[in-house]
Amino acid sequence: KVRGLIQKKQVDNNVILAENAKKIVEERFGDPALSVETVCRELHVSSSFFSKVFKQETGLTFLNYLINRRMEEAKKLLDKTDYKSHVIGEMVGYPEPNYFSYVFKKNCGVSPVKYRKLEETKNGQ
């Protein structure tokens, strides 16, 4: 019974750790310096422990979670604003325009410029 309580507490702590990391991503995904190391320092845990727990709780590595969040925001900005692609890249944590285009295309299947054109066509603009 005691062992079960200890395991439950650990599970709860793991959930809290992952949620806190997700909050940090939400608040600072636009910071190009945001990394596993940064988050681990703030949450006072080792990177190996954190990486294991984060993947267990979210199904994603921290880096993939961060990239997904950045791409989600980039797509929203491409849809809803007229900002140039390189400006959007900077806003979501990629100050180097070519690298932003590379990551966007790798994750979304098309370049940011092409994505915007496809969305405009789809929305009849």
Report the location of each language-model feature:
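An amphipathic alpha-helical interaction segment
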Residues: 1-4, 45
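Short, hydrophobic secondary-structure boundary micro-motifs
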Residues: 34-35, 116
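Basic/polar phosphate-binding segments, predominantly the helix-turn-helix DNA-binding elements
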Residues: 37-66, 91-111
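Terminal helix-turn-helix DNA-binding modules in bacterial transcription factors
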Residues: 56-95, 117-125
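Short, Lys/Arg-enriched anionic-surface-contact patches
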Residues: 8-19, 60-66
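The cytosolic transmitter module of two-component sensor histidine kinases
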Residues: 14-18, 36, 85
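Basic, amphipathic alpha-helical hairpins
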Residues: 3-10, 22-34, 54-58, 75-84, ...
